[in-house]
Structures are given as C-alpha cells and as structure tokens.
A protein has these predicted regions:
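Class I SAM-dependent methyltransferase Rossmann-like catalytic core
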Residues: 2-13
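Class I SAM-dependent methyltransferase SAM/SAH-binding core
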Residues: 44-81
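Class I SAM-dependent methyltransferase "Motif I" SAM/SAH-binding loop
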Residues: 35-37
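Conserved alpha-helix/loop element of class I SAM-dependent methyltransferases that forms part
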Residues: 12-28
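S-adenosyl-L-methionine-dependent methyltransferase catalytic module, highlighting the catalytic core
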Residues: 106-111, 118-211
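Glycine-rich SAM-binding Motif I of class I
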Residues: 39-43
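Short conserved loop adjoining the S-adenosyl-L-methionine
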Residues: 81-87
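A short SAM/SAH-binding and catalytic strip from SAM-dependent methyltransferases
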Residues: 92-104
Length: 211
C-alpha cells in the first residue's frame, strides 16, 4: 500500500509574508520554524521545495493542526531556548511575527544562529509613521493594523523599529543578507524602499553570523 501523501496548498493561497520567506529558502534544506503555528509554512516548503525540518509551537490547538498536516512539531516555550538542538543542525531557522513576543529576543537570535546557518525573522515595525503619530498626538500606545491589541492584553512585550533591530544585529556581529519591508497587505513600493523605517509596517530579514 502506498504511503499517504499530503496535498500541497496552492502557492497563491500562502500568506504573503510566508510566500516571501519561501523564496528565500533553498530546496532540499533543513528548516526549524520557531512558533510555527499550524505548520502552514513547513508543509508548503516540504511539498514545494522538498525541505525537511521541525516546528516548535506552544499552543496545543496548533500542534494538533501540525500533526494532521504531517508536520514534525515539538511543544515547547521559545523562552526556554533551543538547547535540544546541536550546533549547525539546520540550514535556516525561521521566526515569523514572534520576535517581539519573547522575553529574551537577543538571546534567541544567538540561539537561532547557533543551531542554524541563517536566520529569518519578521516583526511589526514600531517606527511606522502611524505608530509615531499615535504616540505623539494621543500620548498612548498605538493600536494599529499590525498591532491590534491594547497595551494591557497584547502578547507583544519587546516592540522595536527597523533601526533598533539593525543596531542589535550590528552589536552582535550579525550580517543582514536580505531585507524586505511591506505594508499590512504585504505590498511594497519605491517610497517604502527609500524610507523603510517610516513607511514599512512589517519587516522581513534574512541574516547570518559574520564570518
């Protein structure tokens, strides 16, 4: 009897930011997805790029979805670190919309580049002009399309701007290989490329340790 297969989702149906990330990942590579959610990205990479790997997730509902999709998943808290994985176990370590929600983001970046050759992260840009205007004119923490929760019930505890992230990378000897800045609908334009920290709502970075 033939082994069961998992149908690949149509490429157009993939969430736009995950679509961008998938283009950064080489075929036949090993991927660790931190905060993998329902496993959509890993399932897509497995079916379209023959990628192997694992997802780390804390939510039991998402873990069940990963299992149904045939995605290798481990239940864990990212703030506990990645000590279960050896150095250079993966080609890529991915973390989408999670960096700002962990207690120790700087330490986690180090761990990403310990277990992986390259890291990929995405996060909401707190330097976007709407966030700046909200604080300047209302004197309150912003609520926006990319930051929809009030300050008292948000999972985001370490919000940053593009400049903040790039400054941290420079301090840690991390080389940025690619950067894409998009709006809420994951579209980009020429003005955004000129003023990314002011006009970009979501940042996507691919990086590695300076050798």
């Amino acid at each position: 009897m033939a082994a069961p297969t998992h149908a690949a989702p149509p490429h157009a149906a993939l969430r736009p930011d995950l679509n961008i990330i998938s283009e950064w990942i080489a075929p036949d590579s090993r991927v660790l997805d931190l905060g993998c959610g329902d496993g959509t990205l890993l399932a897509h990479l497995r079916d379209t790029r023959q990628v192997s790997g694992y997802g780390l997730e804390i939510d039991s509902v998402n873990i069940a979805k990963c299992i149904r999709a045939g995605v290798n998943v481990i239940q864990t808290d990212l703030d506990a670190g990645l000590s279960d994985f050896d150095q250079a176990s993966f080609d890529y370590v991915v973390m989408t919309q999670t960096l700002q929600a962990v207690y120790y983001p700087a330490r986690l970046l180090d761990e990403m580049l310990r277990v992986g050759s390259e890291g990929i992260v995405t996060f909401p840009n707190f330097g976007h002009w709407r966030c700046r205007m909200h604080v300047a004119l209302r004197g309150r923490m912003p609520v926006s399309r990319t930051l929809p929760e009030e300050w008292y019930n948000t999972p985001n505890i370490h919000l940053c701007t593009l400049r903040d992230f790039e400054s941290l990378c420079a301090k840690k000897g991390i080389h940025i290989l690619q950067r894409t800045v998009v709006d809420y609908a994951h579209h980009s334009n020429f003005a955004m490329s000129l003023l990314p920290n002011l006009l970009g709502e979501i940042a996507l970075y691919r990086f590695q340790r300076i050798k």
